[in-house]
A protein has these predicted regions:
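Intrinsically disordered, low-complexity polar regions and short flexible loop motifs
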Residues: 236-240
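GST-like domain detector, emphasizing the conserved glutathione-binding G-site
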Residues: 2-154
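GST-like fold's C-terminal all-alpha helical module
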Residues: 123-234
Length: 240
């Protein structure tokens, strides 16, 4: 779907195919390396053993998304050119085509609730913790200095200017909750643990809520605040 298209881009499966956006003829995901929502999709693709290509998107300028009206990551382009926008929609699309092992949206209220929780609560909670200071923000964005398809200038801008931007984003996310960032994340992990039915949200096997929330927390690994995940009585066991 090009920039000149009159229809406003939406989440979910798009009506126009984009086969020219495939890399190496494989399903292709457009993503940021540390994006929590991209890690959801990576988790499911890895679990199903699906080979795919990845296009690393410049987080400041998003040059690699100029072709799409949808300016957010992740974007998933399947082998036939089908474009799917938004992480939870991508999870449902991939599962439906590869095993159909968990319910579709609207078929399981608990799964829907916890998948929404991953976007609306957990994803925002971890951003407030990761980007709590300028220097934790710089640390989280250090990966951009190692991305081959970014120019040297782009790498520097994304690391140093991007850290300022993400610190501001972290502040705005923190204001969404009553508790300070670390205490809030601890509280949300406690809340999340109530939805785990045995080993998984899905009971005996993982469902969409497992992949959605695991992906969010996986993006924190090695960054500020992950100790809360590792130290949680319920979530640490579920995560591992």
């Amino acid at each position: 779907m090009g920039k000149g298209h009159e229809m406003k881009a939406t989440s979910g499966v798009q009506g126009t195919l984009a086969p020219e956006r495939l890399v190496g003829g494989l399903p292709t995901m457009y993503c940021f390396e540390t994006c929590p929502f991209c890690f959801k999709v990576k988790a499911l693709l890895g679990s199903r053993g699906i080979e795919y290509s990845k296009v690393e998107v410049d987080p400041t300028f998003k040059t690699q998304l100029k072709w799409s009206d949808w300016g957010k990551v992740p974007i998933y382009v399947d082998q036939d050119g089908t474009q799917v926008n938004d992480s939870n929609h991508i999870l449902h699309y991939i599962d439906q085509k590869n095993g159909n092992l968990f319910p579709r949206a609207g078929e399981d209220m608990d799964q829907d609730h916890w998948m929404d929780f991953s976007n609306n609560v957990l994803g925002k909670s971890i951003v407030a913790v990761i980007y709590t200071t300028y220097w934790t923000s710089v640390g989280a964005l250090d990966y951009v200095t190692r991305v081959d398809n970014f120019s040297r200038t782009s790498r520097l801008i994304n690391k140093w200017v991007g850290a300022i931007i993400m610190r501001m984003v972290g502040k705005s996310r923190a204001k969404m909750f009553d508790l300070p960032p670390r205490e809030n994340l601890q509280h949300q992990l406690d809340e999340m643990s109530k939805g785990i039915q045995g080993k998984f949200f899905g009971g005996l096997g993982p469902n969409g809520a497992d992949f959605a929330n695991y992906g969010i927390l996986r993006s924190m690994q090695g960054l500020n605040g992950f100790d809360l995940v590792e130290g949680h009585a319920v979530i640490s066991g579920w995560y591992n």
